[in-house]
Amino acid sequence: MSSLDRLRALLGKPVTWGWARPRLWTTSEQYLGVELPSDYKAFLDLYGPGSIDGYLSLSRPLEADATELERLWSLEDWRWSRLSAPDLYPYPFHPDPGGLISWGSDEHGSEYYFLAIEPNPDEWRIVVGSECNSWFETAGTFCDFLVRCFDRIDRPPFMDRAWPTPDARYHSHA
């Protein structure tokens, strides 16, 4: 069973989404200058923007206009923060080479990223930065990471220990 299939079994059928919009991903990828991981796009094509149990929020393009692309993908503020305090930010931020690309955030202020150092986006690592500047890095795809969170293995030590609950559901924000 693929990790996406496992997430479907864990989260249940999407309530309001469930369709692909390739043009929106193409526009985002043109804005970023890189392709995004295929399982990330597949998950968000299935479930849409929303959150898992209100804890982990995930965004995706809905219109792909300039304002939305900037809101979703720009990390300029983080890039400047890294320049002024490099010890607090051990990773570069996109569009710097090998920079982090944001894909989510949680209710405790942690930010979730792809570490875009491999030529193949399906081989990118996952990085999580906490609001206290603790960092966690792991291998595996987007869906693999979410499954491991459910299995409570190889997940950030600063992640809420009670999340996800066994009856976790995806809550659409669309």
Spans of model-derived segments:
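A generic structural signal for beta-strand entry/edge sites
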Residues: 100, 121-123
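Short polybasic amphipathic segments
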Residues: 123-129
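A surface-exposed partner-binding patch
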Residues: 1-108, 158-163, 170-174
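Short, surface-exposed beta-strand/loop micro-motifs that present aromatic residues
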Residues: 111-118
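Short, surface-exposed beta-strand-loop junctions and turns on beta-sheet-rich folds
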Residues: 120-121, 134
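Compact, glycine/acidic-enriched structural inserts
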Residues: 135-156
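Short acidic/polar capping segments at secondary-structure boundaries
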Residues: 106-109, 131-134
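Short loop/turn segments at secondary-structure transitions that flank enzyme active sites
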Residues: 109, 121, 151
